[in-house]
């Protein structure tokens, strides 16, 4: 029964000027319909993406807008979950991706599952997988809510304070036809989606199209040259239809004002609505027609310099876009060869496991990292975290890895990352990926002296390596933050030569479910501050 249809159990006093008497509230007539009281439970998902470290379930703060000013947003528990010293907040809605195996959420991101590394019993090497939670049945029903301008802006902008020192526009962004008259710059050397998901790769045509009809092109905000796609579907392959829909949504909602983006995101006539309706009806020709319309209309705005002007007023990238760019890079470089990461030496320091995108976002925010600071990842794997810090924050970002296969994949990601950033028109921070033992790499030892945040995923490190790291921390500057899965301070406070106790202040924290690749469970981590 609805709470508005229950009989009142209370009596209240109503004060009148000269007379005081007890008045019983009128009893409401009981409703014949049976309705339940809505509840806000802790809806769980196996892989969560949750933005923002140390945030409360509802917090207001300043975020960048296209006009260069800031506005205040409040994030509900359905969008964020906080990290606390005592408990883990139930997992929330932002679910994506991650290292090494991105997962899936219901907001239109890639729905394909990564290839499983056949080492499920070899924790922590085993990446975490989730089932596809998307359904074509929820295409049109919630369309207007999904495209409501205020909700869309709330999704796009983050709670991170504005970093006014960050310059977001890529130096090689296409500035329109006038720029071509001066110098015609070649397009970025990306790995096109059609190179990894196509009929040639034994995929099947999607949306009822014939083989000769699947080829399409997709326009991006930063370059005049589009990406080639084939509208196909296949196991462990890029979902071209969802990828295209997501690019259209992010390009319009991030790079344009509400008025400029109306043609793409209008509730009734928007191009994105046309794409979704065509997908739900398996209308291939209709989908292709809507895509051509998007390409033409967005290119018109690019020719007028609208994208460049708007980017110049922005100082940060929405996390939704950060995650999507990183996933695009991963899909085209690591995913086709992910089985290489299963080759490791059991019981050694060379065990592969990654921290997922939302965990890194939390860390970057909690440590107050900005574009003028330095981030170092010791044991950087395929480079996911190093690239994320450079893109999300714009800071100088270093990584060092000694496993050969991981290093090779990291280099492939690095090349595609630079090309993708240019394709999207955004400038990342400087990235440096080093090979070898970080205890002996001269460049790493030198950059540690000026590092502001150091990440060490020491979940599977030997005690000897952890002790070696403590010795390296002696060279860190005062105030440097060290993020680790295990503490470097011994439980025995009287342990001889316990250097960590004398140089580190340690804060113990809890992360929610889905934050790491080797398990879906929650866990603990530490933030140590050099003193």
Swiss-Prot record:
Residues 31-62, 69-78, 118-127 have a biased composition (Low complexity). GO terms for molecular function: histone binding; histone H3K79 methyltransferase activity; histone H3K79 trimethyltransferase activity. It holds the Pfam family DOT1. S-adenosyl-L-methionine binds at residues 352-355, 375-384, 401, 437-438. GO terms for biological process: DNA damage checkpoint signaling; DNA repair; methylation; subtelomeric heterochromatin formation. Residues 132-146 have a biased composition (Acidic residues). It catalyses: L-lysyl(79)-[histone H3] + 3 S-adenosyl-L-methionine = N(6),N(6),N(6)-trimethyl-L-lysyl(79)-[histone H3] + 3 S-adenosyl-L-homocysteine + 3 H(+). Ubiquitination of histone H2B to form H2BK123ub1 is required for efficient DOT1 methyltransferase activity on histone H3. InterPro entries: Dot1 (IPR021162), DOT1_dom (IPR025789), H3-K79_meTrfase (IPR030445), SAM-dependent_MTases_sf (IPR029063). Residues 79-102 have a biased composition (Polar residues). Keywords: Chromatin regulator, Methyltransferase, Nucleus, Repeat, S-adenosyl-L-methionine, Transcription, Transcription regulation, Transferase. The keyword Transcription applies. Belongs to the class I-like SAM-binding methyltransferase superfamily. DOT1 family. Histone methyltransferase that specifically trimethylates histone H3 to form H3K79me3. This methylation is required for telomere silencing and for the pachytene checkpoint during the meiotic cell cycle by allowing the recruitment of RAD9 to double strand breaks. Nucleosomes are preferred as substrate compared to free histone. This is Histone-lysine N-methyltransferase, H3 lysine-79 specific.
């Amino acid at each position: 029964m609805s709470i508005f249809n229950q009989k009142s159990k209370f009596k209240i006093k109503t004060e009148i000027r000269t007379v005081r008497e007890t008045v019983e509230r009128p009893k409401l007539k009981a409703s014949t319909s049976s309705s339940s009281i809505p509840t806000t439970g802790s809806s769980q998902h196996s892989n969560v993406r949750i933005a923002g470290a140390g945030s409360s379930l509802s917090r207001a703060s300043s975020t960048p807008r296209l006009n260069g000013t800031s506005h205040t947003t409040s994030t509900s528990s359905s969008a964020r979950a906080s990290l606390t010293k005592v408990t883990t907040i139930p997992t929330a809605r932002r679910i994506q991706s991650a290292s090494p195996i991105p997962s899936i959420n219901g907001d239109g991101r890639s729905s394909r599952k990564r290839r499983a590394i056949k080492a499920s019993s070899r924790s922590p090497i085993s990446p975490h997988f989730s089932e596809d939670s998307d359904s074509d049945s929820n295409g049109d029903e919630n369309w207007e809510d999904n495209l409501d301008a205020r909700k869309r802006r709330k999704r796009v902008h983050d709670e991170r304070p504005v970093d006014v020192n960050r310059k977001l526009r890529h130096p090689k962004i296409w500035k329109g036809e006038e720029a071509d008259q001066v110098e015609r710059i070649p397009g970025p050397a990306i790995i096109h989606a059609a190179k990894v998901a196509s009929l040639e790769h034994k995929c099947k045509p999607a949306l009822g199209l014939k083989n000769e009809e699947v080829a399409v092109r997709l326009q991006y905000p930063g370059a005049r040259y589009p990406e080639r796609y084939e509208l196909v579907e296949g196991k462990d392959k890029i979902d071209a239809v969802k990828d295209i829909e997501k690019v259209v949504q992010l390009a319009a909602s991030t790079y344009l004002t509400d008025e400029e983006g109306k043609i793409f995101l209008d509730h009734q006539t928007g191009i994105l609505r046309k794409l979704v309706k065509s997908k739900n009806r398996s209308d291939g020709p209709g989908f292709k027609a809507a895509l051509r319309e998007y390409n033409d209309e967005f290119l018109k705005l690019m020719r007028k310099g609208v994208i460049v002007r708007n980017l110049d007023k922005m100082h940060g990238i929405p996390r939704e876009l950060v995650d999507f760019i990183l996933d695009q890079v991963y899909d085209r470089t690591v995913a086709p060869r992910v089985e290489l990461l299963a080759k490791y030496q059991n019981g050694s320091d060379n065990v592969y496991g990654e921290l997922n995108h939302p965990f890194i976002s939390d860390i970057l925010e909690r440590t107050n990292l900005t574009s003028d600071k330095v981030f170092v990842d010791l044991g950087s794997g395929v480079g996911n975290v190093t690239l994320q810090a450079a893109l999300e924050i714009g800071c100088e970002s270093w990584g060092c890895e000694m496993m050969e296969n991981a290093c090779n994949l990291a280099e492939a990601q690095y090349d595609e990352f630079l090309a993708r950033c240019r394709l999207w028109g955004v400038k990342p921070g400087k990235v440096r990926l080093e090979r070898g033992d970080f205890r002996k790499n001269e460049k790493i030892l030198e950059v540690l002296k000026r590092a502001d945040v150091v990440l060490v995923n020491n979940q599977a490190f030997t005690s000897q390596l952890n002790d070696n790291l403590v010795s390296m921390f002696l060279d860190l500057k005062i105030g440097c933050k060290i993020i680790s899965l295990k503490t470097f301070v011994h439980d025995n406070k009287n342990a001889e030569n316990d250097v960590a106790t004398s140089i580190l202040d340690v804060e113990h924290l809890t992360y929610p479910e889905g934050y790491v690749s080797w398990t879906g469970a929650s866990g603990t981590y530490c933030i140590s501050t050099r003193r």
